[in-house]
Amino acid sequence: MTDSPADLRSAFRSGRVTPTAGLAPGFAQTNLIAVPQDWAYDVLLFTQRNPKPCPVLDVGDVGSRETVLAPGADITTDLPLYRVWKDGELADETADVSGLWRDDLVAFHIGCSFTFEHPVAAAGVPLRHVEQGSNVPMFVTNRECRPAGRMSGPMVVSMRPVPEHQVSLAAAISARMPAVHGGPVHIGDPTELGIADVAAPDFGDPVNFEPGDVPVFWACGVTPQAAVMASRLPFAITHAPGYMLITDIPDSEYVLEVPDAR
Protein backbone atom coordinates (compact mmCIF):
# COMPACT_ATOMS: atom_id res chain seq x y z
CA MET A 1 0.00 0.00 0.00
CA THR A 2 1.34 3.43 -0.95
CA ASP A 3 1.74 5.94 1.86
CA SER A 4 -0.60 8.92 1.71
CA PRO A 5 0.76 12.47 1.57
CA ALA A 6 -0.29 12.96 5.21
CA ASP A 7 1.47 9.73 6.24
CA LEU A 8 4.66 10.82 4.52
CA ARG A 9 4.57 14.30 6.04
CA SER A 10 4.13 12.69 9.46
CA ALA A 11 7.13 10.45 8.79
CA PHE A 12 9.24 13.46 7.79
CA ARG A 13 8.09 15.28 10.93
CA SER A 14 9.32 12.28 12.92
CA GLY A 15 12.76 12.37 11.34
CA ARG A 16 12.63 10.34 8.12
CA VAL A 17 14.94 11.94 5.53
CA THR A 18 14.63 10.81 1.91
CA PRO A 19 14.26 12.37 -1.53
CA THR A 20 10.60 12.50 -2.52
CA ALA A 21 10.80 11.43 -6.19
CA GLY A 22 8.40 8.54 -6.68
CA LEU A 23 6.64 9.03 -3.33
CA ALA A 24 2.85 9.50 -3.13
CA PRO A 25 2.32 9.02 -6.87
CA GLY A 26 -0.68 10.98 -8.07
CA PHE A 27 -0.15 13.94 -5.73
CA ALA A 28 1.56 17.24 -6.46
CA GLN A 29 4.86 18.18 -4.83
CA THR A 30 6.23 21.68 -4.35
CA ASN A 31 9.47 23.57 -3.90
CA LEU A 32 9.68 25.95 -0.95
CA ILE A 33 11.34 29.32 -0.52
CA ALA A 34 10.61 31.52 2.49
CA VAL A 35 12.05 35.03 2.66
CA PRO A 36 11.68 38.10 4.89
CA GLN A 37 8.67 40.27 4.07
CA ASP A 38 11.06 43.01 2.93
CA TRP A 39 12.14 40.69 0.07
CA ALA A 40 8.78 39.09 -0.67
CA TYR A 41 7.80 41.47 -3.47
CA ASP A 42 11.14 40.95 -5.20
CA VAL A 43 10.63 37.19 -5.07
CA LEU A 44 7.01 37.45 -6.22
CA LEU A 45 8.04 39.63 -9.16
CA PHE A 46 10.91 37.26 -9.98
CA THR A 47 8.53 34.29 -10.09
CA GLN A 48 6.00 36.23 -12.18
CA ARG A 49 8.67 37.18 -14.71
CA ASN A 50 10.08 33.65 -14.83
CA PRO A 51 7.03 31.35 -14.77
CA LYS A 52 8.73 28.41 -16.49
CA PRO A 53 11.18 27.67 -13.64
CA CYS A 54 9.11 29.40 -10.93
CA PRO A 55 5.38 28.55 -11.29
CA VAL A 56 3.77 29.71 -8.03
CA LEU A 57 1.07 27.43 -6.59
CA ASP A 58 0.59 29.25 -3.27
CA VAL A 59 1.96 32.18 -1.26
CA GLY A 60 1.53 32.14 2.50
CA ASP A 61 0.54 34.98 4.78
CA VAL A 62 3.36 36.75 6.61
CA GLY A 63 4.68 34.45 9.34
CA SER A 64 2.35 31.59 8.42
CA ARG A 65 3.61 28.00 8.55
CA GLU A 66 0.52 26.72 6.73
CA THR A 67 -0.51 26.23 3.12
CA VAL A 68 -3.85 25.47 1.48
CA LEU A 69 -2.00 22.84 -0.55
CA ALA A 70 -1.68 20.61 2.53
CA PRO A 71 -4.22 21.51 5.23
CA GLY A 72 -2.89 20.78 8.71
CA ALA A 73 0.72 20.56 7.58
CA ASP A 74 3.51 22.57 9.20
CA ILE A 75 5.92 23.69 6.50
CA THR A 76 8.75 23.99 9.05
CA THR A 77 8.74 20.28 9.92
CA ASP A 78 6.84 18.38 7.22
CA LEU A 79 9.45 18.40 4.44
CA PRO A 80 12.23 15.82 4.76
CA LEU A 81 15.13 18.27 4.47
CA TYR A 82 15.64 22.05 4.40
CA ARG A 83 18.37 24.52 3.60
CA VAL A 84 19.04 27.70 5.56
CA TRP A 85 20.69 30.62 3.76
CA LYS A 86 22.42 33.68 5.22
CA ASP A 87 23.78 36.48 3.01
CA GLY A 88 23.46 34.21 -0.01
CA GLU A 89 25.56 31.45 1.54
CA LEU A 90 24.35 28.01 2.59
CA ALA A 91 24.46 28.13 6.39
CA ASP A 92 22.81 24.83 7.32
CA GLU A 93 20.97 21.79 6.05
CA THR A 94 18.50 20.38 8.55
CA ALA A 95 15.35 18.28 8.85
CA ASP A 96 13.55 20.82 11.07
CA VAL A 97 13.48 24.61 10.75
CA SER A 98 10.75 25.29 13.32
CA GLY A 99 13.27 26.89 15.67
CA LEU A 100 14.58 29.14 12.89
CA TRP A 101 11.22 30.33 11.61
CA ARG A 102 10.51 34.04 11.93
CA ASP A 103 7.30 36.04 12.14
CA ASP A 104 8.32 38.14 9.11
CA LEU A 105 8.83 35.23 6.70
CA VAL A 106 6.68 34.77 3.60
CA ALA A 107 6.59 31.28 2.06
CA PHE A 108 6.31 30.63 -1.67
CA HIS A 109 5.30 27.19 -2.90
CA ILE A 110 6.53 26.55 -6.43
CA GLY A 111 5.45 23.72 -8.72
CA CYS A 112 7.76 20.72 -8.98
CA SER A 113 8.44 18.42 -11.93
CA PHE A 114 8.05 15.37 -9.67
CA THR A 115 4.33 16.10 -10.13
CA PHE A 116 4.34 15.20 -13.82
CA GLU A 117 6.46 12.10 -13.28
CA HIS A 118 3.41 10.02 -12.34
CA PRO A 119 1.51 10.59 -15.61
CA VAL A 120 4.76 10.27 -17.58
CA ALA A 121 5.52 6.93 -15.93
CA ALA A 122 1.90 5.81 -16.36
CA ALA A 123 2.36 6.32 -20.10
CA GLY A 124 5.25 3.85 -20.03
CA VAL A 125 8.19 6.26 -20.01
CA PRO A 126 10.92 5.00 -17.64
CA LEU A 127 12.21 7.32 -14.92
CA ARG A 128 15.83 6.32 -14.49
CA HIS A 129 16.40 8.14 -11.18
CA VAL A 130 13.37 6.41 -9.65
CA GLU A 131 14.48 3.03 -11.03
CA GLN A 132 17.94 3.61 -9.55
CA GLY A 133 16.63 4.86 -6.19
CA SER A 134 18.35 8.21 -6.47
CA ASN A 135 17.52 11.90 -6.48
CA VAL A 136 16.98 13.63 -9.83
CA PRO A 137 20.10 15.42 -11.16
CA MET A 138 19.87 19.22 -11.38
CA PHE A 139 22.17 21.72 -13.07
CA VAL A 140 22.80 25.47 -13.06
CA THR A 141 22.63 26.64 -16.69
CA ASN A 142 24.03 29.50 -18.74
CA ARG A 143 20.51 30.89 -19.22
CA GLU A 144 19.90 33.96 -17.09
CA CYS A 145 16.45 34.53 -15.67
CA ARG A 146 14.75 37.86 -16.18
CA PRO A 147 15.78 39.98 -13.15
CA ALA A 148 13.22 41.51 -10.80
CA GLY A 149 14.05 44.19 -8.25
CA ARG A 150 16.97 42.88 -6.22
CA MET A 151 16.53 39.30 -7.49
CA SER A 152 18.53 37.82 -10.35
CA GLY A 153 20.22 34.57 -11.22
CA PRO A 154 20.53 31.66 -13.66
CA MET A 155 17.91 29.08 -14.54
CA VAL A 156 18.33 25.67 -12.93
CA VAL A 157 17.14 22.56 -14.78
CA SER A 158 16.40 18.97 -13.88
CA MET A 159 17.56 16.24 -16.26
CA ARG A 160 15.99 12.89 -17.04
CA PRO A 161 17.38 10.34 -19.50
CA VAL A 162 14.51 9.34 -21.80
CA PRO A 163 14.53 6.67 -24.52
CA GLU A 164 14.77 8.51 -27.82
CA HIS A 165 11.54 7.06 -29.19
CA GLN A 166 9.64 8.29 -26.10
CA VAL A 167 11.00 11.84 -25.87
CA SER A 168 8.06 13.35 -27.74
CA LEU A 169 5.62 11.48 -25.47
CA ALA A 170 7.30 12.72 -22.27
CA ALA A 171 7.43 16.24 -23.69
CA ALA A 172 3.76 16.21 -24.68
CA ILE A 173 2.55 14.94 -21.30
CA SER A 174 4.62 17.44 -19.32
CA ALA A 175 3.63 20.28 -21.66
CA ARG A 176 0.03 19.86 -20.49
CA MET A 177 1.15 20.71 -16.92
CA PRO A 178 2.57 24.26 -17.06
CA ALA A 179 1.94 24.78 -13.32
CA VAL A 180 4.70 22.23 -12.66
CA HIS A 181 7.20 23.50 -15.28
CA GLY A 182 5.48 22.20 -18.41
CA GLY A 183 7.43 20.84 -21.35
CA PRO A 184 11.22 20.59 -21.61
CA VAL A 185 13.39 23.66 -22.11
CA HIS A 186 16.05 21.65 -23.96
CA ILE A 187 16.55 18.19 -25.46
CA GLY A 188 19.94 16.72 -26.30
CA ASP A 189 23.38 18.35 -26.17
CA PRO A 190 23.89 19.58 -22.57
CA THR A 191 26.72 21.93 -23.57
CA GLU A 192 24.13 24.24 -25.14
CA LEU A 193 22.98 24.91 -21.57
CA GLY A 194 26.54 25.34 -20.36
CA ILE A 195 26.53 21.89 -18.73
CA ALA A 196 29.94 20.30 -19.16
CA ASP A 197 29.18 16.88 -17.66
CA VAL A 198 25.74 15.34 -17.04
CA ALA A 199 27.42 12.91 -14.64
CA ALA A 200 28.35 15.80 -12.32
CA PRO A 201 25.12 17.57 -11.28
CA ASP A 202 25.16 20.73 -9.17
CA PHE A 203 22.29 19.34 -7.06
CA GLY A 204 20.85 15.86 -6.64
CA ASP A 205 22.54 12.66 -7.79
CA PRO A 206 24.10 11.40 -11.02
CA VAL A 207 21.86 9.02 -12.97
CA ASN A 208 22.91 6.23 -15.30
CA PHE A 209 21.81 6.29 -18.94
CA GLU A 210 20.57 3.18 -20.71
CA PRO A 211 21.43 2.58 -24.39
CA GLY A 212 19.29 4.81 -26.58
CA ASP A 213 18.55 7.35 -23.84
CA VAL A 214 18.61 11.07 -24.62
CA PRO A 215 19.08 13.79 -21.95
CA VAL A 216 15.92 15.86 -21.54
CA PHE A 217 15.99 19.04 -19.46
CA TRP A 218 13.10 20.70 -17.66
CA ALA A 219 13.07 24.07 -15.87
CA CYS A 220 13.45 23.49 -12.14
CA GLY A 221 12.13 25.08 -8.96
CA VAL A 222 15.63 25.16 -7.47
CA THR A 223 16.06 28.29 -9.62
CA PRO A 224 15.05 30.56 -6.68
CA GLN A 225 17.90 29.05 -4.64
CA ALA A 226 20.34 30.03 -7.38
CA ALA A 227 18.83 33.52 -7.20
CA VAL A 228 19.25 33.54 -3.41
CA MET A 229 22.96 32.90 -3.94
CA ALA A 230 23.36 35.37 -6.80
CA SER A 231 21.36 38.11 -5.06
CA ARG A 232 22.84 37.45 -1.61
CA LEU A 233 19.56 37.49 0.28
CA PRO A 234 20.20 38.20 3.96
CA PHE A 235 18.09 35.23 5.08
CA ALA A 236 16.03 32.49 3.44
CA ILE A 237 14.72 29.01 4.16
CA THR A 238 14.23 26.60 1.27
CA HIS A 239 13.66 22.91 0.70
CA ALA A 240 16.80 20.90 0.01
CA PRO A 241 16.84 20.06 -3.72
CA GLY A 242 14.81 16.90 -4.30
CA TYR A 243 13.27 16.92 -0.80
CA MET A 244 9.88 18.44 -1.48
CA LEU A 245 6.61 19.24 0.25
CA ILE A 246 4.15 16.49 -0.69
CA THR A 247 0.73 18.12 -0.98
CA ASP A 248 -2.82 16.81 -0.84
CA ILE A 249 -3.57 18.13 -4.33
CA PRO A 250 -4.01 15.45 -7.02
CA ASP A 251 -1.60 15.96 -9.90
CA SER A 252 -4.62 15.81 -12.22
CA GLU A 253 -5.61 19.25 -10.90
CA TYR A 254 -2.67 20.70 -12.82
CA VAL A 255 -3.38 19.03 -16.18
CA LEU A 256 -4.72 21.41 -18.81
CA GLU A 257 -7.78 20.11 -20.58
CA VAL A 258 -7.28 19.72 -24.31
CA PRO A 259 -10.15 21.40 -26.20
CA ASP A 260 -12.36 19.09 -28.21
CA ALA A 261 -11.42 19.62 -31.85
CA ARG A 262 -14.82 18.53 -33.14
UniProtKB/Swiss-Prot annotation:
Official protein name in the record: Putative hydro-lyase RHA1_ro03475
Gene3D superfamilies: PSTPO5379-like (3.40.1640.10), PSTPO5379-like domain (3.30.2040.10)
Family that this chain belongs to: Belongs to the D-glutamate cyclase family.
Pfam families according to UniProt: D-Glu_cyclase (PF07286)
Keyword Nucleotide-binding: no
InterPro entries: D-Glu_cyclase, Putative_hydro-lyase, UPF0317
Keywords carried by this UniProt record: Lyase
SUPFAM superfamilies assigned: PSTPO5379-like
The EC number(s) this enzyme carries: 4.2.1.-
One GO MF term attached to the UniProt entry: lyase activity
